């Protein structure tokens, strides 16, 4: 009986070793495939972006060189709008690829939050194409946050622009934040009075290329990039299911004491 048990153990050991080798090989193949995918995405994005930049540039020249009433200007505007949309898609695809591969750079520094958010609201209001009111609702006293200002701006402007797509003229979009010292995080919220998000779609909106409305322009990657970036920064993002007056996106961002980062 002891001999049979020993033999069985040896066979089991061989199977485990074979399985370990297979798993290692599979892991190496997956990593190689992921590297090839990232290289392909990067190369293709570069190859597509170069001619698109030329199209955008020449369409701008066309717009500025013809009379506003001319039919040609309308066509030039269409070319420029759709070219910019394609450039945004390329940029978004590259961001997703870099986030997944851990190659997107983050540069942390102390940032005065109220001023930073006010600048985002000003930028959004300047570029918006609807008459919805975009406003800031947060404490007026300065607050220093240790963050990557550029990535934080990308997240918030993505959320504000997303809200603008679904908020009619006369509606409002509000950016707010609260500090939760107990959980050592800051909670940002972007609240709109738009069409809202059906409950069965709320978990899907953070998936890549998921669009609530196929007739609304966009790449379908903005919210996916927000989620990946926020998670990379140590936070999370979700939809407030209790808010019924439109849509409310909330995301968390870790906070640090200033002394702890300066040591």
Residue ranges: model-predicted function:
Residues 81-86:
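Short alpha-helical segment of the dimerization/phosphotransfer core of two-component systems
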Residues 18-64:
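Primarily the dimerization/phosphotransfer
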Residues 57, 197-209:
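Short conserved segment of the HATPase_c
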